[in-house]
Amino acid sequence: MLYLNRPVKKRIGLGTWSWGNKLFWNYKSLNDDDLRETYNEALRRGFDLIDTADSYGTGNLQGRSELLIGKFLLNTPSAKKKRIQVATKLAPYPWRIGDRGFNKPFLKSLERLNNKLDIVQLHWSTAKYNPWQELGLLNNLCDLKDEGFDFQIGLSNICLLYTSPSPRD
């Protein structure tokens, strides 16, 4: 595939919304071995992006998807692990405010994912209920990068119409 006359690597990702979600997906921890096999099969077939979120999981299983991925990564050969990108999304819950609102959730996600975190995304826009919250959280992600954490910043489920001006170029 060419984009602006440059070859672009084709990517296919494994989404993990259902992992840990009892409410919508009837998750049971008894099925974790099946999820491990799904993960392994995805890697065998060339999937190189694993998508998750700190909110994937319900109730006391919050973050369960990240925890499972982190566990599976421990048994992934290092050559395969290097080619995988792990993307998570941090939920802009109303209590996560200000330019430090993502610090704790980011560190918890990093821990659950065993320090394999390549892309961190704002999960959805706050424009409809707390428009002032969004810019602070995006700046917080930039601050984390400035502190030495190495990841790309992304947006998920956000229409560009609702995004704040770029926190930093």
Where are the model-predicted features located?
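N-terminal binding-site loop/beta-alpha segment at the start of enzyme catalytic domains
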Residues: 1-84, 146
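CE4/NodB-like, metal-dependent polysaccharide N-deacetylase domain
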Residues: 101-121, 143-147
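Structural preference for beta-strand elements that scaffold enzyme active sites
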Residues: 11-13, 49, 83-87, 116-121, ...
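Conserved small/polar residues in nucleotide/adenosyl-binding loops
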Residues: 162-169
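Active-site beta-loop-alpha junctions enriched in small/polar residues
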Residues: 17-19, 55, 89-93, 122-125, ...
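Charged helix-capping and loop-helix junction motifs
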Residues: 32, 65-67, 101-104, 133-139
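Acidic-and-aromatic substrate-binding clefts and catalytic sites of carbohydrate-active enzymes
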Residues: 53-65, 93-99, 127-132
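Short, acidic/polar
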Residues: 30-41, 98-111, 161
